[in-house]
């Protein structure tokens, strides 16, 4: 795990998974990177959007995130937008992370249940 100076600042959760739904282990891991967690909803991306639309949205969302002065950002969502935002945040010197989880599958008859258990955050490199 990255060493963060006293966890001061804000950890931005830029996903469509509100932190209120996280398990305690994930909350504690996020608070290692910041003294508070701020949820910023990852937008729905129109599959018919072209590259220019996507770049404009990435620029808008990156500016919004940077205005929060994050110590770290969890960025997960639609691949194209995610990639563009991650690159921009990295260029601005922001630590950008994604969640690593263990996938557990339980099959009972014709029903398959999948559970994802958070393990850690990993830095985009």
Question: What spans do the regions from the language model cover?
Answer:
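Long, low-complexity, Lys/Arg-enriched
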Residues: 1-70, 84-87, 91-125
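Short glycine-rich phosphate-binding loop at a beta-alpha junction
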Residues: 71-77
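Conserved histidine-centered catalytic loops in small-molecule metabolism enzymes
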Residues: 80
């Amino acid at each position: 795990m990255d060493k963060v100076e006293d966890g001061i600042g804000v950890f931005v959760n830029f996903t469509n998974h509100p932190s209120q739904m996280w398990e305690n282990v994930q909350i504690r891991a996020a608070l290692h990177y910041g003294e508070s967690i701020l949820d910023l909803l990852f937008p729905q991306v129109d599959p018919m959007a072209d590259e220019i639309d996507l770049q404009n949205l990435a620029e808008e969302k990156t500016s919004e995130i940077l205005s929060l002065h994050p110590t770290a950002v969890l960025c997960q969502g639609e691949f194209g937008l995610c990639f563009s935002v991650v690159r921009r945040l990295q260029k601005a010197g922001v630590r950008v992370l994604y969640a690593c989880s263990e996938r557990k599958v339980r099959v009972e008859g014709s029903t398959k249940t999948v559970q994802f258990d958070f393990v850690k955050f990993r830095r985009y490199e």
